[in-house]
Curated annotation (Swiss-Prot):
Function: Acts as a protein-folding catalyst that interacts with nascent polypeptides to catalyze the formation, isomerization, and reduction or oxidation of disulfide bonds.
A GO molecular-function descriptor: protein disulfide isomerase activity
Tissue specificity statement from the Swiss-Prot or TrEMBL entry: Widely expressed.
Record protein name field: Protein disulfide-isomerase 5-2
Biological classification of the source: Eukaryota, Viridiplantae, Streptophyta, Embryophyta, Tracheophyta
Amino acid composition bias (Basic and acidic residues), ranges on this chain: 430-440
Gene: PDIL5-2
Keywords noted in UniProt: Disulfide bond, Glycoprotein, Membrane, Phosphoprotein, Redox-active center, Signal, Transmembrane, Transmembrane helix
Domain of life: Eukaryota
Length: 440
């Protein structure tokens, strides 16, 4: 009997020890460092933190190695947010059974778990941009602000990367649908109180009003209604872009989801101080013609793009056209350039009048289509790598040594991927091709 009691005590001791050991393994500290997860504590980590961003990596993956310092830099910033976001990583090559269970088929795969709900992340990977994107993903669709101080705090926390829409005197229900629909593109909030100081600070003179701020371009606009029948959404969509948009590799991607045609002004050097009067005229014209996008581009800044509009050394600049955003553009008869001899706004107004009256000549762009420009951003180095990989694969297949890949992404995942990458800078976008996710 005594032996049995001793045996039971020993079993109880072992059970307690194992329990204590297991629980200590699952103790996580929110100290701004990247957590290293295993197959034994993964589920516990997901349930412990409201928001956790997990990097599923392989030690041999070059992209994974380059991502490590970015995650290390972002982790302490995200940990200090009002709604902290924990960064963690898991060796999916080592814990392959868990990786297969959650369908990890490429490296690195990045997942954001928001209250346990997973969402694959395809956004930028540089630390500063990663922080901006993750803050946006976990924020409420529409923030409800109670006072002037909370309005100021909201604007400061939003930063300068995304446009900010604040409905003063508007009910949350009026913009909740837009906040949900365009969550990845802008910040949305409503303020219950509308003080005189707030009206002066945000430059509107009555409520209700929806104020749009575009910090990146230092632009501001106000919508006083009507707040139904699509008018509100139209204002929001138009306000995603500034009144006049500098055209470059990154901003071309912003035009991808905008169906409006682009009034494109081509100059020699877009930074030259003599162009301020022209930009002022274009901005005034854009105010009155919100059904069009107004953009400008310099030959010096983006020559390969400008060449597509038949611009050469003999072309008189600034040249102005209406581009359909793809393969064609309209040139207004008799008004091909903006001269210094006449008021700029008068010339731009005459150009728009001629365009709307149909006094135009349609031309094909001299080069790749819009999607061609987007695709060209991967760079010639990536093309060489791709050609080399294709050659290797063909050679191996000819030897009968290559099996068909088992991991195939769904069409839905591809669409989500394109949507999230819309505003990703050029040097980031090339890292998201499936062929880039796994390497020797």
């Amino acid at each position: 009997m005594r032996s049995l009691k001793l045996l039971l005590c020993w079993i109880s001791f072992l059970t307690l020890s194992i329990s204590i050991s297991a629980s200590s393994d699952d103790q996580f500290t929110l100290d701004g460092t990247v957590l290293e997860l295993t197959d034994s504590n993964f589920d516990s980590a997901i349930s412990t933190f409201d928001c956790i961003f997990v990097d599923f990596y392989a030690p041999w993956c070059g992209h994974c190695k380059r991502l490590n310092p970015e995650l290390d830099a972002a982790a302490p910033i995200l940990a200090k947010l009002k709604q902290p976001i924990v960064i963690a990583k898991l060796n999916a090559d080592k814990y392959s059974r868990l990786a297969r269970k959650i369908e990890i088929d490429a490296f690195p795969t990045l997942m954001l778990y928001n209250h346990g709900v997973p969402m694959e992340y395809y956004g930028p990977r540089k630390a500063d941009l990663l922080v901006r994107y993750l803050k946006k993903f976990v924020a409420p669709d529409v923030a409800v602000l109670e006072s002037d101080s909370t309005v100021k705090e909201f604007v400061e926390d939003a930063g300068t990367f995304f446009p900010v829409f604040i409905g003063f005197g508007l009910n949350e229900s009026i913009i909740s649908g837009l906040g949900r629909k365009y969550k990845k593109k802008a910040w949305f909030a409503v303020s219950k109180e509308v003080s005189e100081d707030t009206m002066v600070s945000y430059d509107f003179d009555k409520a209700p009003a929806l104020v749009a701020n575009h910090p990146t371009y230092n632009e501001h606009s106000v919508f006083y209604g009507p707040f139904e029948d699509g008018f509100l959404e139209e204002f929001v969509k138009q306000s995603f872009l500034p009144l006049i948009l500098p055209i470059n590799h990154d901003t071309l991607k912003l035009l991808k989801d905008d169906e409006r045609k682009i009034v494109l002004t081509i100059v020699e050097d877009e930074t030259h101080e003599s162009l301020e009067k022209l930009y002022k005229a274009l901005r005034a014209a854009a105010h009155a013609n919100r059904d069009l996008v107004f953009g400008y581009v310099g030959v010096k800044q983006f020559e390969e793009f400008v060449d597509s509009f038949h611009v050469d050394k003999k072309t008189n600049l600034p040249k102005i056209v209406v581009w359909d955003g793809d393969e064609e553009y309209d040139q207004v008869t008799g008004i091909e350039t903006i001269t210094q001899e006449e008021d700029h706004l008068t010339q731009v107004s005459r150009f728009l009048e001629g365009y709307r009256e149909g006094r135009t000549e349609k031309k094909k762009i001299n080069g790749p289509s819009f999607m061609g420009f987007i695709n060209s951003m991967i760079g010639i180095r990536s093309v060489y790598i791709l050609v080399f990989l294709v050659a290797v694969i063909m050679m191996l297949r000819s030897l009968g040594q290559v099996e068909e890949p088992t991991g195939v992404r769904t069409a839905t995942a591809v669409r989500e991927r394109v949507d999230q990458a819309t505003t990703v800078p050029e040097d980031e976008s090339s890292e998201h091709k499936p062929s880039d996710k796994k390497e020797d």
